[in-house]
Amino acid sequence: MPATMACPLRLENERAYEMKHASAHASLEPTVSAAHLAAAITTAASMGVREKEHVCDRIYTEQPNLLSSVLAQRSLGVSMPAIDVLLNILIVLYLAIEQSGQVLAIVSEADQERELQRFTAAVRFTEGLAGDALAQSIEQTTAYRREKFLLAYVVDALRRAGLTDPRNETSKYPILVAINLVNCIATARRTTPLGSTV
């Protein structure tokens, strides 16, 4: 291999390794703007089934654990319409990140478990308090502090689909998965097109 090709290849491999093994604790400023999210929502709404399948194929390649967390809901008794809502949420989140020009490090199962434990701990903490415990729990999440636009979209999508009643046992799973998607995205290490780490 020519020396001129070895250097870019090595740099690309090093960047991929750094992203794969990184976790984000950078600035808490939203990295996805309202404009990025609006463009993603519009794009997803105009897609047909085949186009959504192609996006899911890209998600499977780049973020297999996020996709599998949605698809695994069937084994927990979650209905196909609820899983469809979760898939649409994941597609919009993915497109919004893409619109922002960022590339996320692969979210591992350990990352997902860590964020899920944080969120469920916040839910347990607010259970005995007056008012809407779900809203109070959400305010404790990293996503609420870092990716407010994405989180607001997710909560609204769940609400519009009728999936925000935590007393309904099967509604709990979609709520947990959807909030966890945003929490994992909010904490994932990312790079911008210029290669700088965010």
Segments from the language model and where they lie:
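Long compositionally biased, domain-poor regions of proteins
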Residues: 20-198
